[in-house]
Amino acid sequence: MEGEDVQALVIDNGSGMCKAGFAGDDAPRAVFPSIVGRPRHTGVMVGMGQKDSYVGDEAQSKRGILTLKYPIEHGIVTNWDDMEKIWHHTFYNELRVAPEEHPVLLTEAPLNPKANREKMTQIMFETFNTPAMYVAIQAVLSLYASGRTTGIVMDSGDGVSHTVPIYEGYALPHAILRLDLAGRDLTDYLMKILTERGYSFTTTAEREIVRDIKEKLAYVALDFEQEMQTAASSSALEKSYELPDGQVITIGNERFRCPEALFQPSFLGMESAGIHETTYNSIMKCDVDIRKDLYGNVVLSGGTTMFPGIADRMQKELTALAPSTMKIKIIAPPERKYSVWIGGSILASLSTFQQMWISKEEYDESGPSIVHRKCF
């Protein structure tokens, strides 16, 4: 498999969005929702050339008549038939390439079950006939994208958050922590607190509206209690949002109450530690000699770290937990929404990486378990 003349494909399958494109590019060509929609009612649209399923943006735009499903939950693929549909859509409709002509780099969640990486490998070689493939851990790619090989990545997407300490390019599995609290939970929480104000959002279609409100208006307060007092005493923090039907709603303290759940999961009725404490706990599980390097390289990654104010708050909270003399640095690259994909694009275009691919020949010889030997 000579990777010189053929461009590799990089696909980052997130719980909420799929990011896909070509190795060597500086941004993904295609970014679309990781959803598969099926009609709720059969045959209401006569002559529409009805399909039995829709993927991505098309599913999103027809959401009023569809039931939407996410095949990736908490970062891990749970529905392989739908996942195959998403990959098919990625190759043929979004990138318009023949998968049998390009090596494919896929990403996976930290601590992804072994059976899952095998299944991914099997589908790529057997269903799509790719000449070569590789599976890389998402957080490691984010760190590469920030130009580092050592640091701790706090990756928070739509379905799951992880803190992943990485030393000299290797993730330290014993210190990786997973937090099942991410963008989708924050959207649900915002739906709940808006409902308390008398606005009703219930369907899967309305959830997408609330997600948009969250992405456009929410922010992280540096001091939550103080922000609550400010919000109570003045309307300075209020913003208005126009719904698709023209109704205008006003949103006040919900703007920062929503992402506050990242730091106080008890808001969602969860007993776990917040993202700051989880980051600290991850660092404490590492060898004492490398902690200084981790504290000095805390890299934020994923769409749920895009809230304004999150880096300052993280700095404040970690400083309170860490030894008083410790230098703490939070790195929040502006492109962090796509840093996993960007890291994959960098990795797959390195000349030194070309011997790392799992080739079709190796797969035919060893079967799906080859992935554990070659992808670390």
Swiss-Prot record:
This is Actin, plasmodial isoform. It comes from Physarum polycephalum (Slime mold). Actins are highly conserved proteins that are involved in various types of cell motility and are ubiquitously expressed in all eukaryotic cells. The record marks K85 as: Not N6-methylated. It is found in: Cytoplasm, Cytoskeleton. GO terms for cellular component: actin cytoskeleton; cytoplasm. Its main location: cytoplasm. Pfam families: Actin (PF00022).
